[in-house]
Amino acid sequence: SPMVHCYVSQSDRGELVIGGGADTHPSYGQRGNLPTTEAVLNAVVELFPSFSRMKLMRQWGGIVDIAPDASPIISKTPVTGFYISAGWGTGGYKAIPAGGETLAHTIAHDQPHPLVEPFSLDRFAKGRLVDEGAAAGVAH
């Protein structure tokens, strides 16, 4: 939900994975912190009041890489044989299967897959940004 900045998905084992929020003091730490965890859980309970009775099994934090226009970079680079797929933000968890397939095509053919042409690394220099800031439903 963009209003409460959280998401809920169910794992193959039936467990709920709850996430969202951003540390108000960004760093490269990957441990998570209690204030962020509390904010996300409060948001989830606002959406699903019955979740207030759930037990938290574990929590973690991590780094989310986000390109300046909030769109992924899937591209060959000026360095021969060096390709990049990065900047996916939180959308990468859902979209990376297609991202992997299109990157494999780019590597195999040394040309971008037609679906990812707009997401080239040189779009920043050329001023052809792909503004996807609202695509994840949350403000990064």
What is the predicted function of each stretch?
Residues 78-140:
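C-terminal lid/capping helical subdomain adjacent to the catalytic/cofactor pocket in oxidative enzymes
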Residues 1-80, 138-140:
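Active-site substrate-recognition segment that forms the wall
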